[in-house]
């Protein structure tokens, strides 16, 4: 019997307008590389990275969705099962920021009720081209009730932090809560003295 190389699997989703840097952010996080050339994601792509949190190995399965309107119907199916969602906009593109509410509305409509969300203002290294201030980003995050970070895939600012913040919240609320429930169930079921061995 093969043993799993991780303790928990968490599915994350990257959403936002086309060109905001979703693929670049994912590439930086999963492979620590950056490409300046813009390649449009067709439909869906995903990458995997296993991280360690509180002594547990967490396998992150991160789905990169196409931002173009014609792919919206394809991507809605991928909201299901997602435990965390990164909503991205480009700080140099006000329109992508204005569209965050539409993306958020899609999440509310299609994702599970208690999915965790974080708002990311990408390309914060392009200070001279900035159209959206940090304060505007924070104000929108406060309005939507989500955490907020500015990041740069190019200069590797807050990239790990974005994914780790989301993973930490999910682990704390969902996985630890499940373990608590499981422990309570085990305490009640005193008649069952079987020893269950878990693979790690």
Curated annotation (Swiss-Prot):
InterPro entries linked to this entry: P-loop_NTPase, Small_GTP-bd, Small_GTPase, Small_GTPase_Rab
Where is the motif Effector region annotated in this sequence? 38-46
Q: Write down the membrane topology.
A: Lipid-anchor
The entry's keywords = Cell membrane, GTP-binding, Lipoprotein, Membrane, Nucleotide-binding, Prenylation, Protein transport, Transport
Residues lipid-modified (S-geranylgeranyl cysteine): 199-200
Q: Name one GO biological process term.
A: intracellular protein transport
Q: Which residues bind GTP?
A: 16-23, 64-68, 122-125
Q: Name one GO molecular function term.
A: GTPase activity
Q: Which cellular component, as a GO term, is one annotated location?
A: meiotic spindle pole body
Lineage: superkingdom: Eukaryota
Q: What is its main location?
A: membrane
Subcellular location field: Cell membrane
Is-annotated flag, keyword Protein transport? yes
By its UniProt entry, which NCBIfam families does this protein fall under? small_GTP
What is the similarity comment for this entry? Belongs to the small GTPase superfamily. Rab family.
Additional observations: This protein is essential for cell viability.
Q: What does this protein do?
A: Protein transport. Probably involved in vesicular traffic.
Q: Which PANTHER family match?
A: LD44762P
Q: What is the protein's name according to its record?
A: GTP-binding protein ypt2
Q: Where does this protein come from, organism-wise?
A: Schizosaccharomyces pombe (strain 972 / ATCC 24843)
